[in-house]
Amino acid sequence: DLLTAIKRVKESMKRRT
């Protein structure tokens, strides 16, 4: 789903600091 992909991408960006 697009929401799932966006959620994963958002989490990945947040961990990048």
UniProtKB/Swiss-Prot annotation:
The modification Threonine amide is found at T17. Expressed by the venom gland. Its main location: secreted. It is found in: Secreted. It comes from the Eukaryota. One of its GO terms (cellular component) is extracellular region. GO terms for molecular function: toxin activity. Keywords: Amidation, Secreted, Toxin. Belongs to the cationic peptide 04 (cupiennin) family. 07 subfamily. This is Cupiennin-7b. It comes from Cupiennius salei (American wandering spider).
